[in-house]
């Protein structure tokens, strides 16, 4: 089943200070020959694309001023290796609109990048994808004398070849064609339209899959086609060539949408490079075995058969290593980069006397020019003298005869001046290489390419520590900072593009943390942290990361409700379109235009009585409130930990009941919600078994153990993500670059329920039937993205408005909000920006496909945010509103642009993108504040008295039997011996507390040493109270409370009303347990078995306040 996940990447503190440096090797160097502009771009394995202004293009010597100046733009575009990059060269494009590029990546995405004319800000959007790593992208040329027909057009417009455009496809509509190839064995042909939206259309898919599951595409090159024969009786009826992993060269025609020629086994191994030369008359290809071939692309027809002959091989050479990159446009002047780090200049115009000259040798240049930097890069290697030089990933020649190239072993950009053979290096940064999530599920230990170990906090998104190498290896640091706090997994962490990423899936709300673990965080919403209360860690993280986004949506929701309320009652009789007041642009009539969400700036609201038949169409629900909406609204009525502080009283320690009944709030007989719930119970299996009905206990009642509950938890119904349609037909339009399909259908007046339909719902029979149809409708189309949730909310508001009585209308109260912020959830201050990603994980796919990504700045804290849950504790809907003072400009404060990130998007634009692309389950967790929590896994354990011999190491069935069949007296023989762990984990008691206990026990205190309190001198516990079941998150001190309460007689400490955590010890396998340790931690650290945990109890001796008082008085 397909799954949508949300991930966020932690931005390194030096991100903004190293705009001109990659942190992983550079994969592509592109010099776009744009008149009047001097800059080049680099893309890297760190997923970023850097625009370097003319710092490297000037022939003037570098000065200190030019060296210090940071004149580059770093664009974090991808979440995996950026593998290739092209410039979009459109005819008659507006220079003031800036420049456009397209990049492809190992994250399966094709991204359009727009840079403004001043080269100061940038923007991006996903316009396409593949099902595996994308390795290459090339623009498509065309023949000037032939029409180039697009599939979506009835007739292709005449295209005129323009030498300035270098033959790139343009037509009257100024479209741009390009192809992409990848490891999914597919080549996709795309058309990018002109205009501000720049929509990408998938025109055709070439399938190169072979019978032996091979055919991955590694390299491509465009060809200027020649479909008719010239005077030499030659032609080129193809417009690009691809090289695959089998060594085949495949020539395709985008005009005719077919494979024209295939040269099988053109190389023995996979092809690394294909490049057309000399105006597409020659082709050079290289393979991983070091073979270099040159082909003549002027094909001839066979005189006898008339078939098109294959391109002729006119030269072949062998090099001692694989050629990874080729730079040049003519055979007489080429530059090669090989897998050993050498750069060669080649002249292959004379095939009998080919010349290949090595102009760069890594040993010589590294020793002479950058010896210190190289040693620093390899500081973590075992032998600093052993230097490994990787291959050359890419080469680019600038107009000033400077050759740029990159190694696969570092992130440096190397510059070789061909005029004076001067070599220099622009040093790159350092990237993370591995990570380990600690058991507290909040801290992560990482290692970077510099050999440094660091500790990160994934809740506050900050770098906590950078450790010196003297503190040990990576594993040593992990062991040192692994605490005894062991929590269940709520996320997974990984290192991608040199950054630390945290992936959240729909089960992230299953982990809770005690308030004592949050004391070091800065809470910004005035929530008082209770150290003994449990908080949902996943909810804390998402509410802290998206705090400002939530406030933005709350404000938009309030403006929408004001607009709805501003309608007059008489307008209900007519079909009405309500503008929410956010629209700043006129709506387009293009049917394929990207749809906005229901709360988006250009959204509209339609309400009215249009369905006179009283029977709504099958595509629309027949109930005034959707089933999902009713369920979600009722959930906060359940008792849970998020509604109240978790009660640690003994009343929650009780036996497991034999049966449980569904829990529902009592409704009046005339309540619509009551009848709806009755209909759900009778028609929906989900309502009777999943939402409010706890799981039935298993086993026989006499053997049922006691249950120690930490809270009143109810199972939570999780809305599983539906499979998304794999929309890969021809002419697929990527109007919305972040979606797989159109997620929202147009809301027409015919789809809305009428008043007559609502009146019929007053009968329980029709309500029951309509509930069934509603559930069936939901099964047909389950929500996937946040606009689906916003549509449900808007429909609910319309129903509230339509059902509002005249009396309520006169009270001037807004409809009740459906966006509920987490009022009891602490909001943590996030210290840095994050890279937010939305992935689609298809069943059977090799990885996740990126649907959306954006840089999210940390939330600003203002008065509204600091008030936190106060707004939700008393919603503003109960206040009267002035309809004449509806302020539609409340969102202006979100127009702030974070210049340090380099993006041209302000916060409002970022939030609108999030609104379009966040998964439904994630948005529901943000805005619905569901009060039910996941039922904690329960563990079985036994409590038995501690024995000074053997401990619980030999505890098992025999010890259990001995304990159960023990004599009525539990008085010990008075053994005064104690093991070395007696004092471990005991808490110190202040003198004032000791004096308090002294006053309590000054009467009836034992006077002789024979009656001194011993570790085993404790009352017995009845057999019925020995076997227990408790949630894994229960603390040891609460188990102590239960143990003391189940003693058959009271101890002196109990008579003194001392807390059991002060005088009672619990042990597991001889280890004294800390009071704050959870039962999960005990099982993981000490018990290390799947069987019932055996805990032993005894009295503390040395640190007991009561013992101190007794001994002190005896000495007087």
UniProtKB/Swiss-Prot annotation:
Modified residues (Phosphothreonine): 693
Modification sites for Phosphoserine: 668
Keywords (A to Z) from UniProt: Cytoplasm, Phosphoprotein, Repeat, WD repeat
Span list, region Disordered: 578-600, 747-784, 963-994
A GO BP annotation: double-strand break repair via homologous recombination
GO cellular component, as recorded: cytoplasm
Ranges annotated as biased composition (Polar residues): 747-776
WD repeats: 21-62, 91-132, 160-200, 219-262, 266-305, 387-426, 428-466
Coiled-coil stretches noted in the UniProt entry, renumbered to this chain: none
Keyword presence, Calcium: no
Superkingdom of the organism of origin: Eukaryota
Biased composition (Low complexity): 967-987
Pfam families documented for this protein: DUF3337, WD40
First-listed, main subcellular location of the protein, grouped into a coarse class: cytoplasm
Domain-related comment: The N-terminal WD repeats are involved in ubiquitin-binding.
PANTHER family: WD REPEAT-CONTAINING PROTEIN 48
Further information: Present with 589 molecules/cell in log phase SD medium.
Assembly behavior: Interacts (via its WD repeats) with ubiquitin.
Protein name: DUB-associated factor 1
Origin species: Saccharomyces cerevisiae (strain ATCC 204508 / S288c) (Baker's yeast)
Lineage, uppermost ranks: Eukaryota, Fungi, Dikarya, Ascomycota, Saccharomycotina
Gene for this chain: DUF1
